[in-house]
Amino acid sequence: LILSLITIFLFFGILEKKYSLKLEKLTFGGLNVLFDSSDLLYKRSVRNFLDTKRSVFKIDPHFDSFEEVFNSLYDIYNFIRVEIRVLDVKRKRDMELYGISNKMLKKLNQLLTKHQNNYRRWHKYISTNDIVLTRDKDSNGENVSLIYHLTPIGIIQTHYYHFSQLMADFECINKFFCEEVSVVFNIDIAKWDE
């Protein structure tokens, strides 16, 4: 009897969008009932995920491997794409979150489309050949080359042919996530300055 009442209560709660139901696994023990509205559930999920993604808020070209930054940005893009499904666009609060989420997807997509393939192709070539040709000239007027595996990643990356544009676009993403996303999702970005 009690189980039936709980089931009816949950069923009507989900229909009225007072509660959200999230299936972790499709097994008997994997059913989690979360007593939150979709906007709170979504905000918590996004905050918890982004809370560990420093490079989207602050990038350090001297120590951050751009290859790993692209992986992280792609993970964020996919995470938002999947999690956005919980939002009910008929509700005002959900619609606001849907708007900022679409803005995140658009900005991430633009950066990844513009830079990811070219950088990865360049990086694969130099790592495979173990040499980076620089624009610097030696005393004979020939280009200086660096041995890939003996050079810190921060120095290697500065020789990427679109380094300045890539850094400018990373900084735009950082600014957007710091000024807009961190505010909406209540993400503590001050910790990255310590």
What annotation goes with each model-predicted range?
Residues 1-5:
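Hydrophobic alpha-helical transmembrane segments
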Residues 12-77:
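N-terminal topogenic membrane-targeting module
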Residues 53-61, 80-91, 115-126:
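Secondary-structure edge/capping motif, primarily at the C-terminal ends of alpha-helices
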Residues 60-67, 71, 91-102, 157, ...:
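Short, solvent-exposed segments of well-ordered alpha helices
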Residues 66-84, 100, 107, 111:
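Short, contiguous, well-structured surface segments enriched in hydrophobic/aromatic residues
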Residues 78-97, 147-161:
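Short, charged/polar, low-complexity loop and linker segments
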Residues 100, 104-194:
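Soluble C-terminal extramembrane regulatory/interaction domains of multi-pass membrane proteins
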